[in-house]
Amino acid sequence: MNQSRRILRTVYLSLFLIGLFMLINDIFSSNILSSKSSDKEVQFDLNKSFDDNEISSVKSNSFNLINKSQDIVVETGIYVATFSTFKGNLVSLKLKNHLNLEKNPTDLINIDRKNETFFDISFDYFVDDLFLYKKIDDFNHEFKAYFKNNGKTYEYVKKYTFSKKDEYLMKFKVTVNGLEDYNLFDFDSYKIIFSSEIERLSDKAKLQYNNYLSQIIYYDNKLKYGKDGLRINNPRWIGSSTKYFGVLVSKENMEVEFKKERGTLKSFIINNVRNKKNISDEFFIYAGPKDNRYLDVFDKRDDNTFGLFDIFFGMSVEKSFWYLIQVPMQMVMQVFYDVIPNWGLSIIFLTIVVRILIFPLTFKGFRATAELSKLQPKMKELQAKFKHDPKKLNEEMGRLYKEEGVNPLGGCLPVILQLPIFFALYSLVNNLFLLRGASFIPGWIDDLSIGDSVYHFGYKLYFVSWTDIRILPFIMMFTQLGSTIVSSNMDLKNLGAQQKFLYFGMPIMFFFILYNMPSGLLIYWITTNIFTILQQYYIKMHLS
């Protein structure tokens, strides 16, 4: 086999593996959990459920209360939180510093207010009136109601405390006290149904973002995904997570159960009240970006308002197999960004640094290819002489390589070496929160975490899943073709049909595969292609 063809096929085998990697990554991401809204099952403790008439009565009363309820808006330095006097729960939580595609604050709560609330508590279904609201101060807000159970009256209080240091965390305290003179509750536990629906997306954003939703739990120093039937005692935290945001709940001595109901996986936080005279439970809720700059402050007591430590919210950021390569890459990108605050330029500079670092290997590989090309006449003679004896041909080829001091695979090493680098950078660019909403060229590449766009269709083309007209995939395709031609040393006029497909068909195929990839990734790929073209011209001049 012609050595140039061997190298060319190695290149495209690498591209195939890249495409396969991205396909598997997308399939895995999109199938972690498919979640949808549904009516909540009315439930008080682990052993009791309501009949249909009771459920109907509760829902009818709830509908009337919703119509009479008022919204309470609380604004902090980072949040715009909206509470409802119906159930005293959060109905909207907007992040002021993190905008969506429409340049509005991202709303982390994505619920149908008529059917559910963000944090459904068993006691809520016994409250037949609206909650009373009291503003204690700018950071503390209280909702109070009363309910009866088995002839006994209870005072029911929900208190929300926001951080004074604008941390993405609030303390949620549930208090239940009996008003009559009796000792213990006559129930063993109560549940909190934690809504899995987070991050409200517009129709346009749903088309642009590969925004998988997953329910996660951290216990035994491991991040796990929720599944039907899983029940864990005393996890460090439980949460719902999208690609860039998370809502995580931590509480001492809680029990968590995942249960699939009506096709939807739900999270239940079970709280034991056996042998208690009153209830006073505190939950710490992180609601914000999946960014370790914000998540890790709750691992050291002195770093946060609430004095929390060893919560490990930072473990909610999924780490890929290539994490050890990603860390120095991100550090280099951050250095460039600190000098020139543009993440697109940081990706370009990082790519150049990587290419310079592997240049000695690239040069060695190209020199091996050039030396091997000089052996073409002798190789053709051997091929003609032993065309009917493949075993003898291989022996003679091996002897020729040894005598001439040539490694026939030397030109393939740089291509193979780039694979882990590419995979690491793909995972970095595809998941790094800092690239979300980061503009490179305003009006064209406005968000490095999604594809570039010069025209938005408003719908998805059926056959190719395109939502926009994009320019970067075309640039990538042509620069990839140029890079391959320059690197291969092949005579285009003498190419067979198979080789022509490798040259022209594969870049076109990868044009479709990469069309909707994040623009940050395509910037890396294009920069690599251009650098490779210039590098090969330099090497050819040097060797000549």
Curated annotation (Swiss-Prot):
The GO molecular function terms of this record are: membrane insertase activity
Q: Got a GO cellular component term for this one? A: plasma membrane
UniProt entry keywords in alphabetical sequence: Cell inner membrane, Cell membrane, Chaperone, Membrane, Protein transport, Transmembrane, Transmembrane helix, Transport
Q: How does it assemble?
A: Interacts with the Sec translocase complex via SecD. Specifically interacts with transmembrane segments of nascent integral membrane proteins during membrane integration.
The superkingdom of the source organism is Bacteria
The protein's topology relative to the membrane is: Multi-pass membrane protein
NCBIfam families according to UniProt: PRK01318.2-5 (NF002358), yidC_oxa1_cterm (TIGR03592)
How is this protein named in the record? Answer: Membrane protein insertase YidC
Q: Where are the bilayer-spanning segments?
A: 13-33, 343-363, 409-429, 461-481, 506-526
Tell me where in or outside the cell this protein is found: Cell inner membrane
What does the UniProt record say this protein does? Answer: Required for the insertion and/or proper folding and/or complex formation of integral membrane proteins into the membrane. Involved in integration of membrane proteins that insert both dependently and independently of the Sec translocase complex, as well as at least some lipoproteins. Aids folding of multispanning membrane proteins.
For this chain, the family text in UniProt reads:
Belongs to the OXA1/ALB3/YidC family. Type 1 subfamily.
Among Pfam families, the record links this protein to:
60KD_IMP
* GO biological process annotation, one example: protein insertion into membrane
User: Sorted alphabetically, which CDD domains does this protein's record hold?
Assistant: 5TM_YidC_Alb3, EcYidC-like_peri
Main localisation: membrane
